[in-house]
Amino acid sequence: MAGMKIKKGDTVQIVTGKDRGLKGKVIRAIPDQNKVVVEGANRVTRHTRVQQSSRGSQSGGIVTQEAPIHVSNVMIVDPSDGRPTRVGYRFNDDGTKVRISRRTGAEL
């Protein structure tokens, strides 16, 4: 299985699902599951048990947070024009491997 081409900190656009068209930043990448967590997308409600912390405060209740999305449902956004693009790789003159936009050829 090939590695994921989307990394933490990338700006992506969701191409399928209930949040289709939404752009956001990747908060977390989960390579072993081929999933990413996108800021502000795929919000779910979790009911957490109230737990006593060491300082005496309580945490719990109903919490809204982002859930992971499969990488096939997101595309990286080209920084030159803000449109979604596929990702390719190229080697620079000094031998370093860089990600490029398949549409424009710009470095990501």
UniProtKB/Swiss-Prot annotation:
Asked whether the UniProt record includes Oxidoreductase among its keywords, one would answer no
Low complexity composition bias: which ranges?
51-61
The ranges of region (Disordered) come to 46-65
Answer yes or no on keyword Transit peptide: no
Span of the secretion signal? none
Q: Where does the source fall among the domains of life?
A: Bacteria
The UniProt GO MF terms for this protein read: rRNA binding; structural constituent of ribosome
Please give the biological process terms from Gene Ontology that the record holds.
translation
Record-linked Pfam families: KOW, ribosomal_L24
What InterPro entries has UniProt attached to this entry?
KOW (IPR005824), Rib_uL2_dom2 (IPR014722), Ribosomal_uL24 (IPR003256), Ribosomal_uL24_CS (IPR005825), Ribosomal_uL24_KOW (IPR041988), Translation_prot_SH3-like_sf (IPR008991)
The alphabetized UniProt keywords are: Ribonucleoprotein, Ribosomal protein, RNA-binding, rRNA-binding
Cite the record's note on assembly.
Part of the 50S ribosomal subunit.
Q: Which family does it belong to?
A: Belongs to the universal ribosomal protein uL24 family.
Biological role stated in the UniProt entry:
One of two assembly initiator proteins, it binds directly to the 5'-end of the 23S rRNA, where it nucleates assembly of the 50S subunit. One of the proteins that surrounds the polypeptide exit tunnel on the outside of the subunit.
The protein's name is: Large ribosomal subunit protein uL24
Q: In which organism is this protein found?
A: Parafrankia sp. (strain EAN1pec)
From the UniProt record, report the name of the gene that encodes this protein: rplX
